[in-house]
């Protein structure tokens, strides 16, 4: 990973009824004149983050892990009767967590 990139936990609800959890390499933002960029060394996963990460509808008995290293993806099935409630996030890879501790 270069100094221009960072890592993000992502959660994606696919149209075929799966939640996919992955770690994405993303480009670090370039701060404006009145902004700073901090290095995050630790970040918790709070209960509110788990709602986005796993969703209330995930069937944890269907967990599947594929790939390796930075290409690892964890997936699980979603209860089909609850898919309608989650339509707004279909096929969108969303970052999880917004708190952290940095230097």
Name what the model sees in each region:
Residues 48-53:
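Cytochrome P450 core scaffold surrounding the K-helix E-X-X-R motif
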Residues 20-23, 88:
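Residues that act as N-cap/strand-start positions at coil-to-secondary-structure junctions
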Residues 4, 22-24, 100:
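Short beta-strand or tight-loop elements
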Residues 10-13, 54:
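Residue-level signal for short segments within beta-strands and strand-turn junctions
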Residues 29-43, 58-103:
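Glycine-rich beta-strand-centered segment in the early N-terminal region that forms part
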Residues 2-9:
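Short structural boundary motif marking the start of a folded domain
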Residues 15-17:
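Proline/serine/threonine-rich low-complexity linkers at boundaries of modular beta-sandwich domains
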